[in-house]
């Protein structure tokens, strides 16, 4: 009356399920850098340059090789934060810099810019900072490593 089912799952199904779990657990971000704890508090009253769209500030002594914070849209609290380490250089020696604004006083250890491009000082790769750190020219083919941003109450906090 009852039929015994010896192999209810085809042999191909188990490897497919394992592959599905392996692929679905991968991250979209390029985490190529060694872990460095990041917790950067930025008061916008001090860094009011970050209240203007496309403006950026490089904090040279934060993160692995510095942290670049970019204002995308201050009305909606939209900001990006990236590590300044170039993803192309395998020895982590390339630093993505921003073009400084001449004659603009800045805080110690910071560079202010109104340009939305970051350029590696070693390989020359260029990155679009307002489109998520996308490489647009040069040998780099990975995005800059992003950090988490929370903003509000007149400040920005960058964490990992």
What feature does the model see in each segment?
Residues 1-45:
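Bacterial Sec-dependent N-terminal signal peptides
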Residues 13-14, 74-75, 121:
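Generic detector of short alpha-helix boundary/capping microenvironments
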Residues 26-113, 129, 143-160:
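N-terminal pre-ligand scaffold of iron-sulfur
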Residues 89, 122-125:
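Short Cys/His-rich metal-coordination motifs, predominantly Zn2+-binding knuckles/fingers
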Residues 115-123:
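Cysteine-rich micro-motifs
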Residues 126-136:
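Short metal-binding segments enriched for Cys and/or His
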Residues 137-142:
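Short, highly charge-biased, low-complexity peptide segments
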